[in-house]
Swiss-Prot record:
Name the record gives this protein: Uncharacterized protein 077R
Domain of life where this protein originates: Viruses
Amino acid sequence: MGWGFDLKVRVYDKIDKRKVFYMEANRYREARWKLVVNFPPKFLDATRYYCSVVWETCDDPNQCTLQVNDTCWGSTQWDAPEEYDPALEPLLTRLKSGEPLELVSYNRKRVNFYLTQTENVFWIRHSRVPWDWDIEADEPDVEIYYD
C-alpha cells in the first residue's frame, strides 16, 4: 500500500486581498526526502503577504514532519478562499527553534507560517515520488533532495 500525500501553498496580498501565488502537489513519493522551496523575493515581506501551507495524508498517521527555517507554526484551513481574510490568521504557536513539529492526527495535517525569511525549508518524511507542480504565479526555485 502506498502513502498518499497532498500539499497546497497559497500566498495572499494583504493589501488588495488577492491570492497571488499557488502551488499544489498530489503524488505518491519516495520515502524520506527533503524539499527546499525558495519563494519569489517579492513575497517575503510578511507585512504585505500572508502564506498558507496545508497538507493531508493517508495510510500513516505519523508520516509527516514539517520544519520551516528551524521554526514550526500551526494551524490553518485546507480549503482556503481565493481572497485573503484576516480571520485566516489565528494565534500562531511557535515551538522551540529547531524542533520539528510532529503531526500525528490522522489524515489531515495543517501548518501556517509567515514568509519572513529568504528561504523556507520543508522536511517531510515517508513519501514516494518527486512532485509535479501546478503554478498559477511566478515559478519558485524548487529543488528536491533524497536522503
